[in-house]
Regions:
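Short coil/turn motifs at secondary-structure junctions
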Residues: 82-84, 101, 134
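Conserved beta-strand-loop-alpha-helix junction that forms the acyl-donor binding cleft
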Residues: 129-139
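Conserved GNAT acetyl-CoA-binding A-motif
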Residues: 119-130
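Short aromatic/hydrophobic contact patches that present stacked aromatics
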Residues: 1, 95, 128-130
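Conserved catalytic-core motifs of GNAT/GCN5-like acyltransferases
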Residues: 130-131, 143-153
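Polytopic alpha-helical membrane proteins, predominantly small-molecule transporters/carriers
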Residues: 62-66, 99-102, 131
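GNAT-family acyltransferases
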Residues: 1-93, 118
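Conserved acetyl-CoA-binding loop-helix of GNAT-fold acetyltransferases
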Residues: 95-98, 104-117, 121, 139-144
Length: 153
């Protein structure tokens, strides 16, 4: 399930950050989590991202992907709207990541499936996702959710 960031998940968010850092992963969809030292600092920044944070930025809606059975944080996803010129080429509307210990379990596909109706609620009938050419797992996730290759840069 997707939930908005809140204090209830503070320890798990910081644990997520630690696991991603130790694995050397990029923090796609994490709303600057890699650049903060505390949950409070991150939640403040995430709140500012929901508005037009600064010139060149667009509003961003951030969600935590929480496994229903045990309320464990498995991933993060953000939805940026509307597309800026930069996002049209790099990043797209949606960014996401799955914590290393929870990969290959279908969570990325489920997160994307759950966020698409939210995108429509914000007036985006068509969304752009980007991924590196060599990221086969992300390509499969996008295709599984109805995406198609538009172009390569």
């Amino acid at each position: 399930m997707l939930v908005r960031p809140c204090k209830l998940y503070a320890e798990q968010v910081m644990s997520y950050k630690e696991e991603m850092s130790q694995n050397g992963d990029s923090f796609d969809g994490c709303a600057g989590l890699e650049d903060v030292y505390s949950f409070d600092e991150w939640i403040d920044f995430e709140g500012r991202l929901r508005k037009k944070y600064k010139t060149g930025y667009v509003p961003s809606e951030v969600f935590l992907a929480v496994r229903q059975s045990d309320k464990f944080l498995v991933g993060m996803i953000d939805f940026r709207h509307p597309l800026s010129d930069f996002l049209k080429n790099y990043g797209g509307n949606i960014g996401y990541s799955i914590r290393p210990s929870e990969r290959q379990k279908g969570y990325a596909s489920e997160m994307l499936k759950l966020v698409l109706p939210i995108c429509r609620d914000f007036g985006e009938s068509k969304v752009l996702l980007t991924c590196d050419k060599g990221n086969v797992a992300s390509q499969r996730t996008i295709i599984k959710n109805g995406g198609m290759l538009e172009n390569e840069i």
